[in-house]
Amino acid sequence: MKIIYIGPLLWLLGSGGSAHGARPFVTDDARLTTAGSCQLESWTRLNRASKPSARSEEFWAFPACNPSGNFEVTLGAALGRPLQGPQSKDYVVQAKTLFRTLSPGNWALGLAAGKVFHPEINPGPNQFGNSYFYLPWSYASEDERWVMHVNLGGLRDQASKNNRLTWGSGVEWKINERWLGISELFGDTSGGRYWQIGLRYSIMPDLLQVDSSLGRPFGAAATDLQSLALPYGPARWISFGLRFTPASIF
């Protein structure tokens, strides 16, 4: 069977936030990088499909800056290395703003839109076509021990001229001062549905964090992905990430 090649930015999954959610989320939050500063999120994902020929590795870097206070710009890149076939490089540019900021016992709402650059665009669990947008909504508990996130959006695949609606829902909960847990579901109207759970640990609170996550498709998506040799459509994945979030740069 010929291997269908799909770039790594087209399925995730953190960038969320930014184009993925704050690591290790795929579902984005209605928050921005600290005003007057930048942050860097980088991670490696190991895709472990049931067929060895469909396994792959991904390497990601997503710097984001917020120079004005309510306008965040993200420039991201990913390198995908399948076990068989050529490697892929993908790039994304995204802008994000908030209509309402998050506070304890209250909700926030924003808008994000972006463009993915890759010669072969094919949306997958990362919720990307050539162009995309989404509305991130978040709600924080009074004590901020947990925060809920919901995303609704759409994507336009320029190659197939198809439009798809995308969705995501997740919860982050504060275990203690250094540990944070996450769980989420996300997918699109093509039938793709995925779950992911993860942990984040603060080496230096509010500055340097490491994380890890585990996820896989479920329902029709799980059946479809196990029956095809897709380098970026695995039955399951595990990822390891690093976040650098300084309080001020500019």
Question: Where do the protein language model's features map onto the residues?
Answer:
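N-terminal signal peptide c-region/cleavage motif recognized by signal peptidases
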Residues: 14-16
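Sec-dependent signal peptide recognition
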Residues: 1-11
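Transmembrane beta-barrel domains of Gram-negative outer membranes and organellar outer membranes
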Residues: 19-250
